[in-house]
């Protein structure tokens, strides 16, 4: 849709917009609560230095903090949702800016709590629990803070580290400025001979071109820019890795990875098991890349050939009007109680469907504890947006069940778990479409969508996770992370993952230079574990495993009342073992087998 044909926000039919009145009736009501929230936040500073006044007083402090957090979260949710629906609205811009300012004031006002709690001797805190039974309600919340006692420094050292925060973040800030503001990519000759400005946005689209010359030029010209700045980019990334290792060392962790995984109480064995299990099954990815090479009729498959469509235009489309029925049918294995939540999403206007001028791009699930779990879309009538819809509804159902079954303090859930709920829905949709359609072209398209999903999320994100850990280990051992060292080792790793059918040349060796996730401190592995767990659950739910379904719903209701690994064990999945990853790769193999067979039949 061109900019000229885009509706304004005022032109959007109300039925296709989300209903934000579950937050505030209007901006005046928002302002009235904002005034109250400012006073609540200001009052929190009076509790500083008082956590040694007994268990009952500690309960009072926690409740005051939670009450302020709830109100500020509500104010922020309304402001940012209003801004995201139309960023050109000046009133929304003001609301959003003021909400962020209030969030900063809240963070400053409660900054005393964790250090002060950690300064209490363990015996004192346990005495608080004994003398104040109502404090036991907050045991998990407090345990999650106090388990970091061994990694907490003195007050003066903590203050010093906090003051260094901006400096510690400077490698990523520098990379981001270079990558998003300073780099100037060339213009290339696009499809049909027209000039196309190469950008991060056009790069992905141009790699999908059916014209191999366009794909080659796009790839080579894109990496030419990174090659020009390879020394600087290596230095910036190296500094980021050194920062991770330094912070882990001063906090008495055995490694940067141990420090990063400590946040969610995830054993390091989960990470190692992912790398080992995926590494043992790379032959499946090699089969898939070899098949792509054959289908494209190429003597040599280059990295720029991995994204062009294998099957042409989609043989089926899905309209917004059809979406509800498809969602209800595809997610029927989740049971009537889950479908009631899906019905609420459509009937109660959780979803903001269509693009308009000023609306945020992409899709997400948002909201807060006592609001609707909203879904932002920019819907188009295609299969990708159908998958996006069920994905975001998976997040919203997770939020709805956590919020309705947990108190505010335990209602959130970790990133480690978040993608499981959303991707389980995607996998159920895949299963539904494969059961519904017997047309070979439709089945091929759905199978290809799934296979590409595993390639991009399980294999590719595991490759990133392996290289991220390799860099941290190399730096810890004193190896300089020069551009030569990074490029050659990344090229070798790429060859290991994609196999002999793909030419892993020096250009793809430079991919390390453009991956933002390498600055996120052991974040990226969670995409692969989450997708694998989701495939494990969806396979069993689709097969009618009622006991596992109930356990899975228990996970959706649990929020952060347990640590993520314990939540998954209770749901029937031990993520310290390799079984769930192997199960996912078996599904990949079975669908690859069918994909190959259907291709042979339709030749």
Predicted regions mapped to residue ranges:
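Short beta-alpha connecting loops at secondary-structure transitions
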Residues: 374-378, 405-415, 444-453, 472-474, ...
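Catalytic zinc-binding patch centered on the HExxH motif and its immediate surroundings
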Residues: 316-318, 351-371
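A well-structured
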Residues: 1-313, 598-603
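Conserved helix-loop functional segments at active or binding sites
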Residues: 329-340, 363-366, 395, 399-407, ...
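Short pre-active-site segment immediately N-terminal to the catalytic Zn-binding motif
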Residues: 315-320, 368-390
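Long, K/E/R/D-enriched contiguous segments that form extended
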Residues: 295-333, 339, 350, 373-374, ...
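Post-HEXXH active-site segment of zinc metalloproteases
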Residues: 388, 399-423
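C-terminal, non-catalytic "cap/extension" segments appended to globular domains
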Residues: 6, 11-12, 21, 25, ...
């Amino acid at each position: 849709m061109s900019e000229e044909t885009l509706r304004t926000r005022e032109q959007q039919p109300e039925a296709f917009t989300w209903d934000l009145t579950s937050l505030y009736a209007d901006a005046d009501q928002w302002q009235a609560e904002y005034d109250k929230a400012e006073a609540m936040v200001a009052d929190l500073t009076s509790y500083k230095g008082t956590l040694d006044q007994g268990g009952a007083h500690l309960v009072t402090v926690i409740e005051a903090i939670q009450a302020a957090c709830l109100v500020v979260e509500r104010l922020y949710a309304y402001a940012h949702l209003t801004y995201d629906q139309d960023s050109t609205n000046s009133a929304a811009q003001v609301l959003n800016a003021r909400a962020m300012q209030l969030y900063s004031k809240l963070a400053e006002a409660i900054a005393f709590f964790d250090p002060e709690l950690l300064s209490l001797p363990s015996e004192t805190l346990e005495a608080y629990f004994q003398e104040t039974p109502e404090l036991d309600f907050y045991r998990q919340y407090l345990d999650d803070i106090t388990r970091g006692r061994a990694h907490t420094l003195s007050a003066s050292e903590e203050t010093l580290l906090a003051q260094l925060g901006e400096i510690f973040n400077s490698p990523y800030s520098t990379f981001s400025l270079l990558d998003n503001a300073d780099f100037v990519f060339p213009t290339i000759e696009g499809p049909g001979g027209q000039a196309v400005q190469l950008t991060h946005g056009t790069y992905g689209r141009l790699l999908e071109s059916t014209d191999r010359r366009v794909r080659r030029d796009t790839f080579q010209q894109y990496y030419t820019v990174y090659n020009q700045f390879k020394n600087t980019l290596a230095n910036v990334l190296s500094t980021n890795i050194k920062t991770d290792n330094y912070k882990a060392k001063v906090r008495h962790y055995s490694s940067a990875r141990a420090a990063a995984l400590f946040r969610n109480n995830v054993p390091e064995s989960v990470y190692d098991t992912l790398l080992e299990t995926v590494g043992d099954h790379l032959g499946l990815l090699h089969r898939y890349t070899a098949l792509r090479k054959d289908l494209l009729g190429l003597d040599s498959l280059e990295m720029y050939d991995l994204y062009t469509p294998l099957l042409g235009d989609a043989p089926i489309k899905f309209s917004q009007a059809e979406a509800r029925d498809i969602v209800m049918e595809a997610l029927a294995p989740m049971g009537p109680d889950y479908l009631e939540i899906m019905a609420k999403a459509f009937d109660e206007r959780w979803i903001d469907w269509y693009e308009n001028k000023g609306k945020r791009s992409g899709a997400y699930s948002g909201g807060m504890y006592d609001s609707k779990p909203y879904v932002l879309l920019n819907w188009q009538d295609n299969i990708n947006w159908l998958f996006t819809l069920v994905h975001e509804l998976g997040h919203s159902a997770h939020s709805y069940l956590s919020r309705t079954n947990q108190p505010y303090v335990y209602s959130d859930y970790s990133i480690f778990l978040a993608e499981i709920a959303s991707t389980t829905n995607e996998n159920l949709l895949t299963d539904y479409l494969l059961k519904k359609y017997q047309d070979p072209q439709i089945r091929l398209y759905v199978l290809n969508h799934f296979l590409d999903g595993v390639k991009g999320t399980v294999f590719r994100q595991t490759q990133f996770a392996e290289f991220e850990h390799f860099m941290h280990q190399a730096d810890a051992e004193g190896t300089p992370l020069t551009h030569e060292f990074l490029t050659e080792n990344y090229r070798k790793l790429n060859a290991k993952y994609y196999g002999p059918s793909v030419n892993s040349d020096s250009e793809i060796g430079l991919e390390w230079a453009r991956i933002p996730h390498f600055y996120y401190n052991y974040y990226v592995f969670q995409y692969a574990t989450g997708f694998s767990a989701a495939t494990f659950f969806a396979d069993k739910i689709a097969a009618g495993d009622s006991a596992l379904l109930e356990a899975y719903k228990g996970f959706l209701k649990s929020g952060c009342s347990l640590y993520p690994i314990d939540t998954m064990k209770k749901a029937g999945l031990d993520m310290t073992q390799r079984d769930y990853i192997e199960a996912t790769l078996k599904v990949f193999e079975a669908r690859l087998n069918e994909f190959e067979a259907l291709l042979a039949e339709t030749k």
